[in-house]
């Protein structure tokens, strides 16, 4: 397996610290609002990578944090007239609802920054003792010039970064690029007691501390959105490696943006759609399909047309599953014969191809193409003359390859199936009664819902089409 490491800017063979195990940290949301579909892509991408690692046999310890104290949260809590903790509790609950709806698996641990204040204070104290941080009027800053490799993640030296960075001017800092690891309390802000007076942690120190506490000094994979490379991830490296003297993360993975009209989707531009809004119109399968239809390091556009296309594509894949489900109930032969066993064995090439694509830096776009090739093969070769065992095993393979992508796991909608069966029986009765107008109306109504009826020797069958 090869992964693209942002740190080295090249693909590298993936070798975990402990054979068969992966320690993975993903920067999670700041819980002051519903997350938008751009954030959703990041969560879906790294959920998919986690799923695939598990599919390949790795035991994954997956940590994704909640930032539950920062300026945005303080301002939003004040606007709503509630405490910062109440705001965090509210939107963590909303996050889980939307993430569950998107089939994003729960993390092994979802730490909240406010649960690790004691550890963060200790971390800051040790940075000061090591000479990498200094206190000014209750604030504590990290001294970037003390860390030789600062800028390595984004491939720039400190001077170049200073020229291009948007940095807050504070004459108390020794260098403009120095950043806060502890912030002195301002009026009306929540605070915790510390050796430097009441205050709260800086954003970057939270992730460094929680990653170290939950995963150790060195982790296998650290991941997040492309916008976090600098300054957030750069600062995490500086803090963590200054303290431990060890490599913080062996592999850095970053997911590209989602664009609307070729501009990055963001709350600041007010061009975003929340995941919940999109889920009202589209299934999690369709949304995940769109988000994974391009390589995770390549930006994708978000449009209704592309979502509709993703919906149609997912329906094509489910059509194969639905046909196999119907065939299982209709075929008379139960067990596979020798020819069917040979055919089933021939399908292994799709599994091998799927793994080959995903092993190449998690190329979901090409892996999805393999799924379409598999279902096309099955549609052309599994029919009413096949055994129920072959139908079962073919369906199992389609679902198996869909699982790492978080798609094709739903069962046939029984309510829909029952409704259609009732309409078919009503149509049959209308034809017996020579009420052809009613029979045609039922057929046309179903057709308008992309449901086609087929007359077979075993009776009327239905299937969904694009």
From Swiss-Prot:
Zn(2+) binds at residues 27, 207, 232, 236. SUPFAM superfamilies: Anticodon-binding domain of a subclass of class I aminoacyl-tRNA synthetases, Nucleotidylyl transferase. GO terms for cellular component: cytosol. GO terms for molecular function: ATP binding; cysteine-tRNA ligase activity; zinc ion binding. It is an enzyme of class 6 (ligase). GO terms for biological process: cysteinyl-tRNA aminoacylation. It is found in: Cytoplasm. InterPro entries: Cys-tRNA-ligase, Cys-tRNA-synt_Ia_DALR, Cys-tRNA/MSH_ligase, CysS_C, Rossmann-like_a/b/a_fold, tRNA-synt_1_cat_dom, tRNAsynth_Ia_anticodon-bd. Binds 1 zinc ion per subunit. A motif ('HIGH' region) lies at residues 29-39. It catalyses: tRNA(Cys) + L-cysteine + ATP = L-cysteinyl-tRNA(Cys) + AMP + diphosphate. Its EC number is 6.1.1.16. Keywords: Aminoacyl-tRNA synthetase, ATP-binding, Cytoplasm, Ligase, Metal-binding, Nucleotide-binding, Protein biosynthesis, Zinc. It comes from the Bacteria. NCBIfam families: cysS (TIGR00435). Belongs to the class-I aminoacyl-tRNA synthetase family. Monomer. This is Cysteine--tRNA ligase. The gene is cysS.
